[in-house]
Amino acid sequence: MLSPKRTKFRKQHRGRMKGIATRGNSIAFGKFALQALEPSWITSRQIEAGRRAITRYARRGGKLWIRIFPDKPITMRPAETRMGSGKGSPEYWVSVVKPGRILYEISGVPESVARAAMRIAAYKMPIRTQFITAITSV
């Protein structure tokens, strides 16, 4: 699963997800992509589940790019712990995803295969997504 090798600080504020994605919202590497339509945190486990689903479906050929990285630590306190005594310890990592953000890109497979693979990955995501195609200028 994805996680940063090291960070400047162990813990982060939760933050807010206002507006739409201004970066990472267009296809850069592949021909087909899965785009987020809602704001959410996507965990490293969910990213990995989507990656596995796509690679299993499009087994021969095809290149996959993961366009999001979980760089935000989410803290949790132990169960049945009294209030106070500081913030909990980091438990898992999430990627902050805004509407319009590209999650996965794929190329080297037919559109029908890419569409089916992305649909399987979309079921693993906690948000609504859409399948998009790169505009090829000839």
Curated annotation (Swiss-Prot):
GO terms for biological process: mitochondrial translation. Its main location: plastid. It comes from the Eukaryota. The keyword NAD does not apply. Coiled coil: none annotated. It holds the Pfam family Ribosomal_L16. HAMAP family: Ribosomal_uL16. NCBIfam families: rplP_bact. Part of the 50S ribosomal subunit. This is Large ribosomal subunit protein uL16c. It comes from Physcomitrium patens (Spreading-leaved earth moss). The gene is rpl16.
